[in-house]
Amino acid sequence: MTLESMIACCLSDEVKESKRINAEIEKQLRRDKRDARRELKLLLLGTGESGKSTFIKQMRIIHGAGYSEEDKRGFTKLVYQNIFTAMQAVVRAMDTLKIRYKYEQNKANALLIREVDVEKVTTFEHQYVNAIKTLWSDPGVQECYDRRREFQLSDSAKYYLTDVDRIATVGYLPTQQDVLRVRVPTTGIIEYPFDLENIIFRMVDVGGQRSERRKWIHCFENVTSIMFLVALSEYDQVLVESDNENRMEESKALFRTIITYPWFQHSSVILFLNKKDLLEDKILHSHLVDYFPEFDGPQRDAQAAREFILKMFVDLNPDSDKIIYSHFTCATDTENIRFVFAAVKDTILQLNLKEYNLV
């Protein structure tokens, strides 16, 4: 073989190898592009306690592995802590609101509960069970509970406090509903990916309290949809961080900011008006017009109230071409969320698959 033919042979091998490598790179780039298309990022936003974390739990139940017995057991301590936190809040409010206990022994029970360091609670001992049950049955405490908009109390307080006997049993294992009702403030960012119809939905939950919001900024890239939660029942409540600011006004201000962000010009917006069950209960004795004087609908009418609240939020949208998709929800009701998210999923897929030419 001549030198020239040897060089030509080597060169052709190099060219072949170079082509093979290029083909591999092209293939990987196509794969990466396809995978990026297959992942949709859903950003879950809303003020503190609007129901975002509960919504994520529902996604795990409906579209993920759910909660095993071992997972549920991991919530036991948190259920106990939620009960103590709730009763401590009520006991403190009894003093602040100057409400008297009907039963004399409840002064001692209140003192016993106040002295508990909630973060160290891991069990539910007999003396505390009795103290909490006796306190909860006191007409003074019930009067205080009826005035709960005047202090900070978790929405799940009544759910747990009326079921102390079940929770106090030996070998107690939290139910799925117990898990959904547990309140643990979200600090930092929680991501929950789940696979639906060969597309990964990556749901991102960020803390709703003001102090948490500065951590949101890096979540804003490549967001497919904004899912914004509003607690319908917060129309008469004040912020945890500021006791002279209305929670719903804060929610409106945040929503206005979010929908006008340049980052989100190409993201669809889905508005969940959550806690519709709590609104139905509250509207019977707390009048919307007292907090939003522009409301001119009938009193004690949950339908009129929620339609008014929906309009308040939709009217914040300055872009007439941008559709805001809205749903009334109860995040603790698995069947309601299953139904609503099926509709939401279809909306998101239709909007995005067109964009990616996948339909």
Curated annotation (Swiss-Prot):
It is found in: Cell membrane; Cytoplasm. Residues 38-359 form the G-alpha domain. Its main location: membrane. PROSITE patterns: G_ALPHA (PS51882). Residues 329-334 are annotated as: G5 motif. Mg(2+) binds at residues 53, 186. InterPro entries: Gprotein_alpha_Q, Gprotein_alpha_su, GproteinA_insert, P-loop_NTPase. Keywords: Cell membrane, Cytoplasm, GTP-binding, Hydrolase, Lipoprotein, Magnesium, Membrane, Metal-binding, Nucleotide-binding, Palmitate, Transducer. It comes from the Eukaryota. One of its GO terms (cellular component) is presynapse. GO terms for molecular function: alkylglycerophosphoethanolamine phosphodiesterase activity; enzyme regulator activity; G protein activity; G protein-coupled receptor binding; G-protein beta/gamma-subunit complex binding; GTP binding; GTPase activity; guanyl nucleotide binding. Residues 270-277 are annotated as: G4 motif. Pfam families: G-alpha. Gene3D superfamilies: GI Alpha 1, domain 2-like (1.10.400.10), P-loop containing nucleotide triphosphate hydrolases (3.40.50.300). GTP binds at residues 46-53, 180-183, 274-277, 331. It is a lipid-anchor. Belongs to the G-alpha family. G(q) subfamily. This is Guanine nucleotide-binding protein subunit alpha-11. It comes from Rattus norvegicus (Rat).
